[in-house]
């Protein structure tokens, strides 16, 4: 999970300014183990805050950016019934299994979720710079993380 600030980055060199536009406060990288049912609960919570029928219940206005899973959702369904199926890689999410998760700030994973929460010394900007040095040039393809069905 990451932040949503800044405009999309156009193809070409990614600058330090671009990185700070993505995640301006440069928080530390955190990890936590989430059980499958917590992942579904978090997704349902986020979808309700995004697509609530009552506009006064809407908060944030976006579905969190995520990577590493695919969720098939019915936006029009009532709260708690939007997530239809989740896959981690090619495997269906197992509600009783723990999954290692990486995030930044409690906006990514609220403190009520998970076990073995750790805040690491590496900070977000340094992690992004390391990633870019390994995987440039980048290709940003749609991954179908959230699919409305």
Task: Label each region the model flagged.
Residues 1-149:
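Catalytic centers of hydrolytic enzymes
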